[in-house]
A protein has these predicted regions:
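Fungal secretory targeting signals
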Residues: 1-21
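Zn-dependent metallo-beta-lactamase
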Residues: 17-109, 119
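Active-site HxH/HxHxD metal-binding segment of metal-dependent hydrolases
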Residues: 26-37, 42-45, 120-124, 128-195
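Conserved beta-strand hairpin/beta-sheet module of binuclear metal-dependent hydrolase folds
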Residues: 77-133, 217-238
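Short, hydrophobic/aromatic-rich segments at coil-to-beta transitions
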Residues: 86-92, 193, 201-204
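Extracytoplasmic/secreted proteins, especially bacterial periplasmic and envelope-associated proteins
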Residues: 89, 121, 125, 154-158, ...
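Divalent metal-coordination and catalytic microenvironments
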Residues: 90, 104, 114, 147, ...
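Metallo-beta-lactamase
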Residues: 110, 117-119, 195-197, 202-304
Length: 327
């Protein structure tokens, strides 16, 4: 009996060791050797307070999951099919799980925000999504690139070559994209404060550097069964590596929060589904009772707190990285 017990203990120990070894191979535990623990504690709890219960999921994603468990964060936006759909009157989701794309039917053609990763996705996902919604690629009259990361502009050149939309980006974004093989042909430059009216929709644009130097944010009206709301679409909430870029990101987020408050923004739209919780919202829209709240409409106070909380999460990451910011 004793011999069997020893054998069982040895087997359990061996299996435990094997599991631990496999776990270490599978899961990369993030450490922060230069962490400023006092500053992390300060800003993490300030961000949590700013978020409150209503924004706790956004707080958890930006302040904790994306920083301490980046592999799990990345797993929330793996490439995958999402059925295209109308989210507001004439505003459509036409992206995939890893990166969003939006189309607004202005009455004078479609304005498309972002072009997915590459030509194959533009041809195989974005255009078929439009076709399923009753449009065609030729309806794309305007293309807005929110920032100069390839997952947002990789399909732009294919769209330009095939449908010739007027293509818009900020000057810093164009400066980066034109030097990349397969990047779009430079077209129209959007500057700070530019207003673009197409058909019955007006877009107010702001250059919000931080995530990238050329990140572009916009404010525009949306309608829910005819009821007017104002959407804020921030160009990129991902936290940059350099301290100077983090300073820019915080300043841009706080400035856009002020602009959004002046414009009475109450609706959150983003260029990744895990930043505006689109996957959750789609299911809620599918099961929305008559007269029920629209999940993208979070209210003006919550939108303001969302941006300021994101800025505080940037401070958390700086403190984890041992960086001292100027803002």
């Amino acid at each position: 009996m004793k011999t069997n017990a020893v054998k069982l203990w040895s087997l359990c120990a061996a299996l435990t060791g094997f599991a631990e070894a496999q776990f270490q191979d599978f899961f990369n535990i993030t450490t922060f050797p230069n962490e400023q623990k006092e500053n992390v504690t300060k800003w993490l709890n300030e961000a949590r307070a700013t978020a409150g219960p209503a924004l706790s999921a956004y707080f958890g994603h930006r302040c904790i999951l994306g920083q301490v468990y980046p592999e799990l964060s990345s797993a929330t936006q793996l490439s995958g099919f999402i059925a295209p759909r109308e989210v507001f009157d004439n505003l459509y989701y036409i992206g995939q799980s890893a990166v969003s794309a939006w189309a607004y039917d202005t009455g004078e053609g479609l304005v498309v925000f972002d072009a997915l990763n590459n030509a194959a996705e533009a041809e195989g996902i974005l255009v078929p999504a439009l076709e399923k919604l009753g449009f065609a690629g030729t309806d794309i009259k305007h293309l807005v690139i929110t920032h100069e990361h390839f997952d947002h502009y990789g399909g732009a050149r294919w769209l330009q070559d095939n449908f010739h939309p007027a293509t818009y980006a900020s000057a810093p974004a164009w400066a980066a994209m034109v030097n990349v093989a397969g990047g779009p042909v430079q077209d129209k430059v959007i500057a700070e404060g530019d207003v673009l009216t197409i058909g019955n929709v007006t877009f107010n644009f702001y250059v919000t550097p931080g995530h990238t130097p050329g990140s572009l944010s916009t404010i525009f009206k949306v309608y829910d069964n005819g009821v007017e709301h104002t959407a804020g679409f921030y160009g990129g909430t991902g936290i940059p590596s350099a301290a100077a870029a983090k300073d820019q990101q915080i300043a841009s987020m706080n400035r856009f929060a002020d602009l959004a408050k002046e414009a009475n923004v109450d609706t959150l739209i983003a260029n990744h589904q895990n930043q505006d919780r689109s996957l959750y919202h789609f299911d809620l829209l599918d099961h929305r009772p008559d007269g029920g709240d629209h999940p993208y409409v979070i209210g003006g106070d919550a939108f303001d707190r969302y941006l300021r909380m994101n800025g505080q999460c940037v401070r958390v990451k700086a403190a984890r990285d041992g960086q001292f910011l100027q803002t």
